[in-house]
Amino acid sequence: MNQENSIVTRSDLCRRIESLPQVNIGHYPTPLEPCPRLSEALGGPKIYIKREDCSGVAFGGNKIRQLTFTIGEAMYQGADTIVHGATAQSNHCRQAAAVAAQLGLKCYLRLSRDHKSFVQGNLLLGHLTGANVELVDAPFGPELDVVK
């Protein structure tokens, strides 16, 4: 049987994940919080919310899980700078800038300007973490698809 068709066990998967370069930046595991009123309103299924906002870096969020590996790989390869681009209020860029500051990396953020690009929220936090922030008129993400 070739490797593409082989079954990967949980222990195999854990071993493979653990072998990847990563940085310890999150506070895990994040808690599960019961939602009894929502459960009752929906007729009984027990509903829980995973509290990724408790992951610890720059007000938390699920992006920290990805950055654990992408920045881990970058550092493994000797990078001293990270570059991210998205919209001005990007959660991912906010967290990337905070992680870079925490780890002593330089950070450049290239963010698309919009009519609401006041220096507040995630854009302000990018500045406060010491990232080099450049606002550009070029679109990113779904906005870019519209331009195409």
Label each region the model flagged.
Residues 1-148:
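PLP-dependent amino-acid enzyme catalytic core
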